[in-house]
């Protein structure tokens, strides 16, 4: 134990990598440098500061500006901004850009804590909307356009609508309907799309927030796509929130010394999607189909929208992201897992995402997940 306590963090990380664990968590690249070769190149020799020929994130006009323009084209936004402080920084910037101190904001109760931090920092007055609960899996359901429309009638002073879609569990809300309800009152919509950077890139996936009329959306590249942890995009669409204000707030809520390693991984991710996105997403969808087929016969595991649950109707849920695999274990399955040496929490229901689905993972990983032969974890299942 003393020897373990004395090991440096990088040594522990290296040992974890060499142990060959199957990643059931973020980041979306799954340590797959073969898929995204640029990630393997991002070491200390490429870690620089703002040199003229490498552009400046806070005043972009060169390679960074070009990378963000390419991202805007891919996601269909008026403007997209690289975020080195993750979706957290993007949410803070977006909320600040769309509001003034003392404004009333309509907020889904299951928003990320960054939204609550923004409310505190910006001195906002929140009006909370409670999503329905899907009883079978115990998950927060979808926010509905009717809820939003009624809340805007009841609170005519609201200046912004904020909600997550998809959620961590893959629950998608009717963003087109919500935007229609909000825009009828002249109110902009911010979608926390942290878990949805992949949406809209394949017909099997729901459309993204920008395609449905959202004014602002924040998407974590590192959660679902091959980019380094802490990388995200802030998308701006529509004309209800001025672009200069969005740009200014991204500068306020990001480091003045943004990492070129993080920015290079974002630029590389965008280029990968441009060049190989269609084939990669087709392969991803094919493996999700294989996953569905592989779990059909499982008796002690239910997966939201997959396997025996495919095509099921869940009250309170508008749609599901098929890339998400929230799972329900009965108590008996947890006991079986513990006997096999798995470190499962001592609770009846364990919902988590099998994140080998996050990005086009290799076939052997898909088989390991579908057959239930994952490695034991050292801690609780995420």
What does each model-identified segment do?
Residues 5-14, 18, 38, 74-77, ...:
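Conserved PLP-enzyme active-site core in the AAT-like
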Residues 41-87, 110-111:
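Conserved N-terminal alpha-helix of the aminotransferase class I/II PLP-enzyme fold
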Residues 279-354, 358, 368, 372-382:
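Conserved small-domain helix->loop->beta segment predominantly found in fold-type I
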Residues 1-62:
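N-terminal "arm"/small-domain region of PLP-dependent enzymes with the aminotransferase-like
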Residues 30, 223, 268-270, 322-324, ...:
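Glycine-rich beta-alpha junction loops
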Residues 71, 268, 364, 382:
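Active-site or pore-adjacent capping/gating segments
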């Amino acid at each position: 134990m003393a020897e373990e306590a004395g090991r440096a963090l990088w040594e522990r990380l290296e040992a974890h990598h060499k142990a060959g664990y199957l990643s059931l968590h973020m980041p979306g690249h799954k340590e797959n440098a073969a898929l995204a070769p640029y990630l393997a190149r991002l070491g200390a020799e490429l870690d620089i500061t703002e040199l003229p020929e490498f552009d400046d994130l806070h005043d972009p006009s060169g390679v960074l500006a070009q990378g963000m323009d390419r991202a805007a084209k891919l996601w269909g936004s008026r403007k997209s901004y690289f975020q080195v402080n993750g979706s957290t920084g993007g949410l803070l910037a977006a909320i600040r850009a769309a509001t003034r101190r003392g404004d009333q904001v309509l907020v889904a109760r299951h928003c990320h804590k960054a939204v609550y931090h923004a409310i505190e920092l910006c001195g906002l007055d929140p009006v909370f909307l409670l999503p329905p609960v899907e009883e079978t899996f115990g998950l927060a359901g979808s926010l509905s356009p009717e809820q939003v429309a009624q809340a805007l009638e009841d609170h005519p002073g609201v200046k912004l609508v904020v909600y997550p879609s998809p959620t961590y569990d893959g629950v998608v809300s009717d963003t087109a309907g919500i935007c229609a309800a909000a825009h009828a009152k002249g109110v902009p919509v911010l979608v926390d799309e942290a878990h949805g950077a992949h949406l809209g890139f394949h017909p099997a996936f729901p459309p993204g927030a920008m395609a449905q009329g959202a004014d602002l959306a924040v998407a974590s590249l590192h959660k679902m796509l091959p980019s380094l942890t802490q990388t995200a995009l802030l998308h701006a669409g529509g004309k209800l929130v001025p672009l200069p204000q969005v740009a200014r707030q991204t500068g306020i809520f990001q480091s003045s010394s943004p990492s070129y390693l993080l920015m290079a991984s974002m630029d590389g991710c965008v280029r990968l999607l441009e060049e190989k996105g269609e084939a990669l997403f087709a392969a991803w969808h094919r493996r999700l189909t294989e996953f569905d087929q592989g779990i059909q016969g499982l008796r002690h595991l239910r997966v939201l929208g997959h396997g025996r649950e495919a095509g099921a109707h869940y009250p309170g849920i508008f749609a599901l992201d098929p890339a998400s695999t929230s799972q329900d274990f009965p108590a008996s399955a947890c006991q079986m897992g513990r006997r096999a040496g798995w470190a499962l929490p001592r609770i009846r229901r364990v919902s988590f995402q099998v994140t080998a689905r996050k990005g086009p993972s290799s076939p052997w990983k898909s088989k390991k997940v579908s057959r239930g032969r994952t490695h034991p974890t050292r801690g609780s299942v995420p």
